[in-house]
UniProtKB/Swiss-Prot annotation:
GO terms for cellular component: host cell cytoplasm; plasma membrane. GO terms for biological process: regulation of cell migration; regulation of protein phosphorylation. It holds the Pfam family CypI. It comes from Mesomycoplasma hyorhinis. It is found in: Cell membrane. A lipid is attached at residue 24 (N-palmitoyl cysteine). This is High affinity transport system protein p37.
Length: 403
């Protein structure tokens, strides 16, 4: 579930004892028995960066997420200090308190962590933005935690990438499975009971027994039967000019799930007939509009849209905005999903000591395992994993997704 990208910085599986650490080079592993920390290096207070918009969201004059975050911090402090006191290397150190501070966005989070200012110790960031940041600033912050989410019932395997865009392409096959859920039983007709709406997601679309450490974007198409057939023909013929002229809705230029991942698919599929979205948009400005995919049905001149994979899963069909609504003789369907990109990554400022990092990572894992994480699941984080090798587990997967 990708709803977390809209709402927060911090939050938003295999559960094993603490036995790892990520080096400052972001590629190696430091065994716990090799790590030592002095009393002066021990932080008695740790601050997490949390989305300012989420943290300050109000309803009736009250901050609606205040209780959620307070309960989470209480649970986190209790579990962390239990682990600390059970560890011979840390049991004599002071117990640690935890608090949150508001952060505007992912870019601000990375910039603040890179200053190594103890007013901000940790946050969770989009993997793509993190990888690109570290290319220009190697070793300046320390990735240590990978988030996971309940997998979609139609997409449980990360190792599926673009092949040729035909019906046998694994990414097209996923799109066809999406259509069985979204189109064959029309989304507009879903009831809260039949599809298990819990106030945040349609639970029927997820398999909580399988944790996914990746997400994708997707390309929607819309129209009556004749228009859909023409769009598909342009796709199959690799006729970029005709395809683009059906009009494309997209997200911000820096969005991976609503711009960059789809751009990679278009490059691979249309090859030398396509350059970049920005170049093509400059040449054909009327064919593009920055707007949410769930509004595609309301726009007569646009028939293609980019979105997060399965965004309807966390979009209530009874919303006043009437998401994904189309004209009576038209429908929306998935054309193809994108390559997978790693889910979000937890990052420490450089000087947080290694033992404390280890304990924080294990605390995240334990809270999820014991159903005591009152914060993450509301926004799409259902589990956590330690990162043993940032280069292999995150960077290489990311690079493969966008090439």
């Amino acid at each position: 579930m990708l709803k977390k990208l809209k709402n927060f910085i911090l939050f938003s599986s295999i559960f094993s004892p603490i036995a790892f650490a990520i080096s400052c080079s972001n590629t190696g592993v430091v065994k716990q028995e090799d790590v030592s920390v002095s009393q002066g290096q021990w932080d008695k207070s740790i601050t997490f960066g949390v989305s300012e918009a989420w943290l300050n969201k109000k309803k009736g004059g009250e901050k609606v997420n205040k209780e959620v975050i307070n309960t989470f911090l209480e649970n986190f402090k209790k579990e962390f200090n239990k682990l600390k006191n059970a560890n011979d290397k840390t049991k004599n150190f002071d117990d640690v308190d935890f608090k949150v501070t508001p952060i505007q966005d992912f870019t601000v989070l990375l910039n603040n962590l890179s200053t190594d200012n103890p007013e901000l110790d940790f946050g969770i960031n989009a993997s793509g933005k993190l990888v690109e940041f570290l290319k220009n600033n190697p070793g300046i912050i320390t990735p240590a935690l990978e988030t996971t989410t309940n997998s979609f019932v139609f997409d449980k395997e990360k190792d599926k990438f673009y092949v040729d865009g035909t019906d046998s392409d694994p990414l097209v096959k996923i799109a066809k499975e999406i259509n069985k859920i979204f189109v064959e039983t029309p989304y507009a007709s879903w009831t809260d009971e039949n599809h298990k709406w819990n106030g945040n997601v349609y639970q029927s679309v997820y398999d909580p027994t399988v944790q996914a450490n990746f997400y994708r974007g997707m390309i929607w198409i819309k129209g009556n039967d004749e228009t859909l057939a023409k769009i598909k023909k342009a796709w199959n013929d690799k006729d970029w000019n005709t395809f683009r002229n059906f009009g494309i809705l997209h997200g911000k230029d820096n969005s991976f799930s609503k711009f960059k991942l789809e751009e990679t698919i278009l490059k691979n599929h249309f090859q030398n007939k396509f350059t970049t979205l920005n170049e093509d948009r400059s040449a054909h400005p009327n064919a593009y509009k920055q707007k949410s995919a769930d509004t595609l049905g309301t726009l007569d001149d646009f028939h293609i849209a980019f979105s997060e994979e399965g965004s309807f899963a966390w979009t209530h069909n009874k919303s006043a905005t009437k998401p994904f609504e189309t004209k009576a003789n038209e429908k929306m369907e998935a054309l193809i999903v994108t390559n997978p990109i790693p889910y979000d990554v937890g990052v420490f400022r450089k000087s947080v000591n290694q033992l404390e990092q280890n304990l924080i990572v294990q605390t995240f894992i334990n809270l999820a395992k014991n159903k005591q994480d009152t914060y993450g699941p509301l926004l799409g984080y259902n589990g956590y994993k330690k990162i043993d090798n940032f280069q292999k587990e995150i960077v290489e997967v990311y690079e493969k997704a966008i090439k």
